[in-house]
A protein has these predicted regions:
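Short, hydrophobic/aromatic alpha-helical segments in well-folded domains
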Residues: 16, 107, 130-131
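Short secondary-structure transition/capping segments
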Residues: 92-101, 142, 146-147
């Protein structure tokens, strides 16, 4: 493995970790996923530390070289279980059969690019607001105004 390959791998692992974290994955899951993927790609030892605003990854290889990189997470953390499931499936696939880095990069960015249809979210918000207004003693007109 070349130095450039290892650096690119580390960068892609951070991309994956950031994508998982910002779509709602818990911190332990991100740490475990990045550790397993790094070892699947040839790292002898992985040291991964994740909090909601930062990811630190150190990869140690059998040749004796180590690479460390930190990524600050500034994107808002939301919940998108569909994207999270795609990223989890990608990580499982990579642990079973190692993908080429170019394919890995394409898969990560494809999963992150897909946009979520917010129509159902808006309809649900309207129904919830109107229902709560009526539930807490408002009239039907209050429910419509709240929606």
């Amino acid at each position: 493995m070349t130095v450039e390959y290892k650096k690119r791998l580390l960068h892609l692992l951070l991309d994956l970790g950031e994508a998982m974290l910002t779509t709602g994955a818990e911190v332990n899951r991100v740490e475990d996923t990045l550790s397993r993927m790094g070892q699947a790609y040839g790292a002898e030892k992985m040291n991964v530390f994740v909090i909601t605003s930062s990811i630190v990854v150190t990869m140690s290889f059998s040749e004796g070289d180590e690479y460390t990189q930190t990524r600050r997470i500034q994107k808002p953390i939301g919940t998108d279980f569909q994207k999270l499931e795609q990223l989890n499936a990608l990580s499982r696939k990579c642990c079973e059969q190692v993908l080429d880095l170019q394919d890995l990069e394409k898969s990560i960015h494809t999963s992150c690019q897909e946009t979520k249809d917010r129509t159902y979210t808006h309809i649900g918000s309207i129904l919830a607001a109107g229902s709560f207004a009526i539930f807490f003693g408002g009239t039907f007109a209050d429910g419509i105004i709240a929606a």
